[in-house]
A protein has these predicted regions:
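Tryptophan-anchored aromatic micro-motifs
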Residues: 1-10, 23, 27, 70-72, ...
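A generic structural motif
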Residues: 3-5, 17, 75-77, 99-101
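N-terminal glycine/threonine-rich, aromatic-flanked beta-hairpin/loop signature
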Residues: 10-62, 95-104
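Short, hydrophobic/aromatic-rich segments at coil-to-beta transitions
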Residues: 65-73, 93-97
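Functional cores of ribonucleases/endoribonucleases
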Residues: 73-74, 86
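Edge beta-strand at a domain terminus
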Residues: 93, 101-116
């Protein structure tokens, strides 16, 4: 489950899976009834695609040395901005520390696994 920047407000259910040795993440369900239904602000092939099914994590590769997933990209569908990405699994994969970088700036979100 992804959360807003306040870390308390759930925004979406995101399914994260391996595909061809990389992690991808797709929105499975939007939890905010006020949010847009399509990614109108996206600038690439995701422009105007439905939020449900939208691939927001692309290309993260496993770094066995430190256990992180690196060199990926994460999309903020609210404003269409794409960030460099590092994912650090914690608590046996039940928690993901998601860090997006834009230049020298970054922000971190904590995502929690839902269901089986």
């Amino acid at each position: 489950m992804s959360f807003d920047d306040d870390g308390k407000t759930p925004t979406a259910l995101v399914r994260i899976a391996k595909s061809n040795g990389q992690l991808i993440g797709r929105i499975e369900k939007v939890l905010d009834a006020q949010s847009e239904t399509t990614c109108s602000k996206c600038l690439d092939d995701r422009k105007n695609q439905s939020m449900v099914g939208l691939e927001i994590i692309r290309g993260a590769k496993h770094d066995a040395q430190n256990g992180q997933w690196i060199q990926g990209r994460i999309l903020d569908p609210d404003d269409g901005t794409e960030y460099r990405l590092v994912i650090e699994p914690q608590s046996a994969g039940q928690v993901l520390v998601i860090r997006g970088y834009w230049g020298v700036f970054w922000r971190t979100q904590i995502w929690r696994k839902q269901g089986p």
